[in-house]
Structure formats: C-alpha cells, structure tokens
C-alpha cells in the first residue's frame, strides 16, 4: 500500500494511523477457524508441522477456555512463537460501540467489526437476557436481513453482508468478557446474572438475519461453541431460529444438531405470505413436513414454534385451533410473543386477555405455550426490535436533511 505524504502533519498522522489499522484488519483471525483451518494457517505461517497438533490444543484452550484476546497472555507459549503469531494473526475483539442496560437487566451491545479488506466497517447488535438460573445470549448471523418480515424491525434494514464464523463467535466471547464469564474476570457491579455457574448458559440464533442463509459460517461457529474442549456449550442449550429455509432445516439437524425454532407467526398461507414472505417460496406444508422429519426430534428435543401476537391479525381462537391442528403429532413448544412495538410499525400487540385465551386453548390441547415476557423494550432489545444503530442514525440524518430541504423550499 502506498501513502502520499503531500499532506499537513495532522493529515499525515491520520493517514498513517489508518494505514496501521488497515494492516491490522488485514490479518486473519484465529477465532472461528476449525482445527483443520487453524492447522493449515499455522503451517503456512511457519509453525513446524510436527508441533501443529500441540499448538492447536494450546491455542484452543487460551481462546475458548481462558478467553484471552492478546497473544502476550498465552503464558505457556514461547515469546518468539507469540511474536510470530501476533505478526500473522489477530485474536482481537470487536469494538463495543455502545452498551445499553434495560431496567429489567437486559443488556444490548452494538458491536463494530472491521471491513476485513473491503467495504466499510459493519455494526450488529447482540442481546443478553438474564433470568433466574440462566442467562441467554441472542446472537446475530447477518448484518441486516433479506426477509422483510412485515412485523420485524430488523427486516426494515437491507442485508449488508453475512457475518463470518469469527464475527458470530466474537459476540459470545465479547459478551462473556463484559459479564465476567471467563476465569479471572470480574462481573460488573450490579449486573443481573445467574447467582451460580456460567453467566451465559444458553445461546439463541435469533438476532439480526436469517441464520440458514449463512449456513456454513453459522455451522462452523456453533460447532466451535459446542466443542467440549473449548466453550463447551451443550447443543441442547443452543437454539437456531429460522423463518423456514426448508432445505437447510434438514442440514441443520444432520450437520449441527442443535435445537430448532421456527418463526411461524401464522397458520394460513395467505397471511404468512404477508407476515413472513419466505412462505411464498417454502409454504406451510413444506415447512411442517421438514419439521416432522427433523433429525433427533423427540419429546426431549422438541421444536419451538414462535408466534407473535398481532391484534386482530392472527390472534383469534380460530387461529389457535388451526395452530393445534397444523402441529398435530410434532413434539413442540409454542412460544407466544406479545408484539414489541417499534417506530413506524402499523401493527399492535394483542390485548392481554386475548393472548391468555389463545394460550389456554393451546395448553389444553397438550402443547406448552408460555407467553414470553417482553424484555429490554426500553432499549429496543426485545424480539423483533434489533437494528444496527448506524442504520438508525443514517436514516435519522436523511430525515433531518429532507426536513431542511423542505423548509428551504418553503421560504
């Protein structure tokens, strides 16, 4: 990379700083690599092949058990090797642009990732939901989304790109950093977290994006997250939520083996076509068939069906009856989600009395149908509310500019 020095001193400093950052960002991250990929990368960097298996074991422990983000902290690796690793690779965390804490203890982070050689930095949101005895991290798989589900705030942000396995895992690693969930890390004062054990006990792929439109990177990240020699999360505590990418549902069961959740939200094709437009490609009959055939499906490994409660849209008792009929014979749990409002939406949340009637009918038919307690609404961290802050700012700036132009024309 060439640098022009026909600049002021301040400009030169800025350009040199950008050059240094670009060099740093160009280095591949060891986070998110499979063991096979890490072996190839280490050999290419000059690690003797006879040492590779041992070095991978050391690195895996430091990255995923100890949670270090600086090669200098890897104390059982020689100084020369640490220097070589730092020259060729990075294990740095993303920038935490913002952390918001809800009155109910929910935390939302805005993470910024470097461009990695092209384009501009990207931002995504992750949410931590503490409950008694457990803590759930909601992770994003894409920057934006392609699905345009009409009730979902994320769907109003166009897809920018898929996240890499590194960026998916970095959300978990950084959240564990912030919560003191690695050895020798302190929990923030006043943080609402489980009283004993891990701070993050569960992860759900329910953040920004459709995970199954980024299958390979999501697969790699979740297999690392569930690896017994590292982060060691049980696959029964990892849930992948999809709007219904039918071909990849089969692959999810065969190749990843985590718990499955379906963003259902309607029991008639004509309504689901509007609420969840992917239904036009994979209608309900195909989706439900894939669910019935999901590998490992049992009463101990039920599918969760998510159903947002929209006033006078999908919340009638007739809808409840059709829901029970549609899912007949599938080991399932039905999460009823009170609609979380966001600026500009035309939908309203169902009345609480109607939600309870709906739940009572489904429960009486033999399906657990908990009503999800809204969490983090005051920081737009609740289900369906995620959208990167940078996108909101750009939109607000455009609106402000348009208002100024209108005002100018009116003079």
UniProtKB/Swiss-Prot annotation:
Disulfide bonds join 138-383. [4Fe-4S] cluster binds at residues 145, 149, 152. Binds 1 [4Fe-4S] cluster. The cluster is coordinated with 3 cysteines and an exchangeable S-adenosyl-L-methionine. Its cofactor is [4Fe-4S] cluster. Belongs to the radical SAM superfamily. RlmN family. This is Dual-specificity RNA methyltransferase RlmN. Reaction proceeds by a ping-pong mechanism involving intermediate methylation of a conserved cysteine residue. Specifically methylates position 2 of adenine 2503 in 23S rRNA and position 2 of adenine 37 in tRNAs. m2A2503 modification seems to play a crucial role in the proofreading step occurring at the peptidyl transferase center and thus would serve to optimize ribosomal fidelity. CDD domains: Radical_SAM (cd01335). Residues 131-380 form the Radical SAM core domain. One of its GO terms (cellular component) is cytoplasm. Keywords: 4Fe-4S, Cytoplasm, Disulfide bond, Iron, Iron-sulfur, Metal-binding, Methyltransferase, rRNA processing, S-adenosyl-L-methionine, Transferase, tRNA processing. It is an enzyme of class 2 (transferase). It comes from the Bacteria. Its EC number is 2.1.1.192. The active site is at 125 (proton acceptor), 383 (s-methylcysteine intermediate). GO terms for molecular function: 4 iron, 4 sulfur cluster binding; metal ion binding; rRNA (adenine(2503)-C2-)-methyltransferase activity; rRNA binding; tRNA (adenine(37)-C2)-methyltransferase activity; tRNA binding. One of its GO terms (biological process) is rRNA base methylation. Pfam families: Radical_SAM, RlmN_N. It comes from Brucella abortus (strain 2308). HAMAP family: RNA_methyltr_RlmN. It catalyses: adenosine(2503) in 23S rRNA + 2 reduced [2Fe-2S]-[ferredoxin] + 2 S-adenosyl-L-methionine = 2-methyladenosine(2503) in 23S rRNA + 5'-deoxyadenosine + L-methionine + 2 oxidized [2Fe-2S]-[ferredoxin] + S-adenosyl-L-homocysteine; adenosine(37) in tRNA + 2 reduced [2Fe-2S]-[ferredoxin] + 2 S-adenosyl-L-methionine = 2-methyladenosine(37) in tRNA + 5'-deoxyadenosine + L-methionine + 2 oxidized [2Fe-2S]-[ferredoxin] + S-adenosyl-L-homocysteine. Its main location: cytoplasm. It is found in: Cytoplasm.
